[in-house]
Amino acid sequence: MSDDASRLPDYLGHVQQAIERIARYTSGMDEAAFRRNTLVQDAVIRNFEVIGEACRNILRDEPDFAARHPELPLSGAYEMRNALAHGYFKVDMGVVWTTIVNDLPSLLSAMRAVAVAIGSGLKS
């Protein structure tokens, strides 16, 4: 890392905020409603891109932290970001929905726990 102060709390906060936005945008929806609403799809994809970019920054700038926290799917989040950002109209919304339902709640919990552990001041 450079001589600048650690950006880790910022990156963790970006992930948390993006997950919370996705949850808000999809609240009350089932998969069929999500598939019909391209506006929500676009907003969700944008926030997945934020998650992936923040995870890439953690991997790049804080490799020791990343190594100490294998429970955080940092590489997977970045890979998903790349698939979404470069997939254009080939994105599988079923995979996106499954990720929202099955993976984001546990990722949010893990990010909050890590943030509390490092004292970043994020909401727990």
Predicted regions and their residues:
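Solvent-exposed interaction patches of small proteins and small membrane subunits
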Residues: 1-124
